[in-house]
């Protein structure tokens, strides 16, 4: 029991808020292109464009979602869609700041949890546009999403379809011709509606304060690691 408690404390210390990202102004837009497959009718795009304030304007335009299995969460995943076109191989949610799947604030959620911050897809044909203050189009940023992927899930976290996030001029034959996977998301993220998190642009935290909290978490984790070593 003592060691379980220590592990829990360490996990809390390592968790941190994602900093506000305002470094995308003037950067190249990105897009995830979804195409129909033999097992999925989902098609359309999710576009990422630099906003005037340096955050990212996200435009979702998808059709063909299967009836009866919504609402549909969607997330940025940590790996691209491979040549095998298997959505399971995209790994877990993109989470460079050790966010949580159950957090109550946008900054504390996993960075890739777009639907957690802005709401699930709620219909078989769906369009929405919003500003996200945490992901980045800057290749030098820890929050950069280029080269990763997006997975659309059913309400039980089955991976329905996936697409690579590429620049507008990149080919994406491998990126979006993804196969159906009956396995649930490896990160076991629960479905969330729009009341679970507001738009990233409404968060009042600053980039500096986010970075400060991350640094403090690092110091705390190091101290706890020392305590663990002394107890073992």
UniProtKB/Swiss-Prot annotation:
The alphabetized UniProt keywords are: Antioxidant, Cell wall, Copper, Glycoprotein, GPI-anchor, Lipoprotein, Membrane, Metal-binding, Oxidoreductase, Secreted, Signal, Virulence, Zinc
Subcellular localization, as worded in the UniProt entry:
Secreted, Cell wall; Membrane
Q: How is the cofactor bound?
A: Binds 1 copper ion per subunit.
Q: Where is this region: Disordered?
A: 174-211
Where along this sequence does the record place binding of substrate?
213
- TM ranges: none
Q: What protein does this entry describe?
A: Cell surface superoxide dismutase [Cu-Zn] 4
Name the source organism: Candida albicans (strain SC5314 / ATCC MYA-2876) (Yeast)
Q: What is the lineage of its organism?
A: Eukaryota, Fungi, Dikarya, Ascomycota, Saccharomycotina
